[in-house]
């Protein structure tokens, strides 16, 4: 074999060996990657729907890095699938309520840029609670705050912050609204936002940050909604809306919404005569609301919503210690569970209550005539026995010398049960405090507890003489 042939032979053998090594390396790489990906493969949903790993549903952002012959392969482990809330756990057993949050918005407004608001409420997603309110399009230390006692102007917007964070200049304006409701279905937020002319308002339904549906006024007389959280069960959210007279017959309808789309509308049925500003809570498998009768009754209407068949029933809270303001004194007040009591029914205030077996927990102003003070208590038999008046576990939330306002309920799911919480609106400014030209509020929040608790009073606390005019 001559030298040239030797060179060719050696080169061919080397090339063959190199090719074999290269193919083996590829085989090893493919096998390793296949085994690695198979190990962390996510189970597909039963309906074979594509489940993208979007930031809004990732609970833990874990990355696996595997080094193979100087090649880096990254694969994100699929997160736990997010499910609709069903609220099927039992209601927590409580002995009363413990302090939870206070935002001190009015006190902070004396030296900072804080929004002028009213109609606040609280609602929670599966991991965190938020406070909402209807802003007046201005901060308090601003001449635009003059005459903000008016409810419906085109500049009002729904504000949203983490609970305990006052509505500062960086606060998100969720939508245009002078009446609203919000709730989280387990996957995303739904906001119901009403704005427009009194005789031809529009309700916009915003889901996951996008406008999905809308509905116009059906009675041409101030379309309005709850001013507290709506409730979603297995992807169906319910919201109570009223259009019509505030001191006479009105048209109340219950809307059923799925991912922002109206799927059904049911008229109010049952014995309730007038229903506004409902405070709703999940009562699996349905939704229960305690509302405001602004026409005939100082006892509060109850609206029961069947999420499965869209049926509605209504009546009144049985407790003879009634929850609205104004009202008769406790010795002369009445409720027969079925009808309005025709006791100082016109005007009223938003409030709440919830059933506990045959009993009822409730909150109300301490004053029977005005929005002053705030108290909570349990009425034995107050859910099932007409005119029951046996009161236990009374607590003062705001003493009678200080102003209160609207109040409402929200629910929080723990590992074993569903807790009930409430907020109280602490109104300041006009009409009562005429030194200033504005009207605004702060809030205080309490939640149910199975423990012991003390006493106190948690008013707004701002010195009106130190406030901007």
Curated annotation (Swiss-Prot):
Location within or outside the cell: Virion membrane; Host apical cell membrane
Keyword Protease set for record: no
Annotated GO biological process: carbohydrate metabolic process; viral budding from plasma membrane
This enzyme's EC code(s): 3.2.1.18
Its membrane topology: Single-pass type II membrane protein
Cofactor section: Ca(2+)
Residues involved in substrate binding: 118, 152, 276-277, 292, 371
UniProt KW keywords: Calcium, Disulfide bond, Glycoprotein, Glycosidase, Host cell membrane, Host membrane, Hydrolase, Membrane, Metal-binding, Signal-anchor, Transmembrane, Transmembrane helix, Virion
Annotated binding of Ca(2+), by residue: 293, 297, 324
Family annotation (Pfam families): Neur
Residues that span the membrane, as ranges: 10-30
Highest taxon above the source species: Viruses
Glycosylation sites recorded in the entry for this protein: 61, 70, 86, 146, 200, 234, 402
Transmembrane helix among keywords: yes
Residue ranges with Low complexity bias: 331-343
Residue numbers spanned by region Head of neuraminidase: 91-469
GO molecular function, one term: exo-alpha-sialidase activity
Regulation of activity: Inhibited by the neuraminidase inhibitors zanamivir (Relenza) and oseltamivir (Tamiflu). These drugs interfere with the release of progeny virus from infected cells and are effective against all influenza strains. Resistance to neuraminidase inhibitors is quite rare.
Posttranslational modification: N-glycosylated.
InterPro entries, per database record: Glyco_hydro_34, Sialidase_Influenza_A/B, Sialidase_sf
Record's miscellaneous remark: The influenza A genome consist of 8 RNA segments. Genetic variation of hemagglutinin and/or neuraminidase genes results in the emergence of new influenza strains. The mechanism of variation can be the result of point mutations or the result of genetic reassortment between segments of two different strains.
Protein name: Neuraminidase
Natural source organism: Influenza A virus (strain A/Qu/7/1970 H3N2)
Protein encoded by which gene: NA
């Amino acid at each position: 074999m001559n030298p040239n042939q030797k060179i060719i032979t050696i080169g061919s053998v080397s090339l063959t060996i190199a090719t074999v090594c290269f193919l083996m390396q590829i085989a090893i790489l493919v096998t390793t990657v296949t085994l690695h990906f198979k190990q962390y493969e996510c189970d597909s949903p039963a309906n074979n729907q594509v489940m993208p790993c979007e930031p809004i549903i990732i609970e833990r952002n874990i990355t696996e890095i595997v080094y193979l012959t100087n090649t880096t392969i990254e694969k994100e482990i699929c997160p736990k699938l997010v499910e609709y809330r069903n609220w099927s756990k039992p209601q927590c057993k409580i002995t009363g309520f413990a302090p939870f949050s206070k935002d001190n918005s009015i006190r902070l407004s004396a030296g900072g840029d804080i929004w002028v608001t009213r109609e606040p409420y609280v609602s929670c997603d599966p991991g965190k609670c938020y406070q909402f309110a209807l802003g007046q399009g201005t901060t308090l230390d601003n001449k635009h705050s003059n005459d903000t006692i008016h409810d419906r102007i085109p500049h009002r917007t729904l504000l949203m912050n983490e609970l305990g964070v006052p509505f500062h200049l960086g606060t998100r304006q969720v939508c245009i609204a002078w009446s609203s409701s919000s709730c989280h279905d387990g996957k995303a937020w739904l906001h119901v936002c009403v704005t427009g002319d009194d005789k031809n308002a529009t309700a916009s339904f915003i889901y996951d940050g996008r406008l999905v549906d809308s509905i116009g006024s059906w009675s041409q007389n101030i379309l309005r909604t709850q001013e507290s959280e709506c409730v979603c069960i297995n992807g169906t959210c319910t919201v109570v809306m009223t259009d019509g007279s505030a001191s006479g017959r009105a048209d109340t309808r219950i809307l059923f919404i799925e991912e922002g789309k109206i799927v059904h509308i049911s008229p109010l049925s049952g014995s309730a005569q007038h229903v506004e500003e409902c405070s709703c809570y999940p009562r699996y498998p349905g939704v229960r609301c305690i509302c405001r009768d602004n026409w005939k009754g100082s006892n509060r209407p109850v609206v029961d919503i069947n999420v499965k068949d869209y049926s509605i029933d209504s009546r009144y809270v049985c407790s003879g210690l009634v929850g609205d303001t104004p009202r008769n004194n406790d010795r002369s007040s009445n409720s027969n569970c079925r009808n309005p009591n025709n006791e100082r029914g016109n005007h009223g205030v938003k409030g709440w209550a919830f059933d506990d077996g045959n009993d009822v927990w409730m909150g109300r102003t301490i004053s029977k005539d005005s929005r002053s003070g705030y108290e909570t208590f349990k009425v034995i038999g107050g859910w099932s026995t007409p005119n029951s008046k046996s009161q236990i576990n009374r607590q003062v939330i705001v003493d009678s010398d200080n102003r209160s306002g609207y109040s409402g309920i929200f629910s929080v799911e723990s590992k074993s049960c569903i807790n009930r919480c409430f907020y109280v609106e602490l109104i300041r400014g006009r009409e009562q405090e005429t030194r200033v030209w504005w009207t605004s509020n702060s809030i205080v929040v309490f939640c149910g507890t199975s423990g012991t608790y003390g006493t106190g009073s948690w008013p707004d606390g701002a010195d009106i003489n130190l406030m901007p005019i």
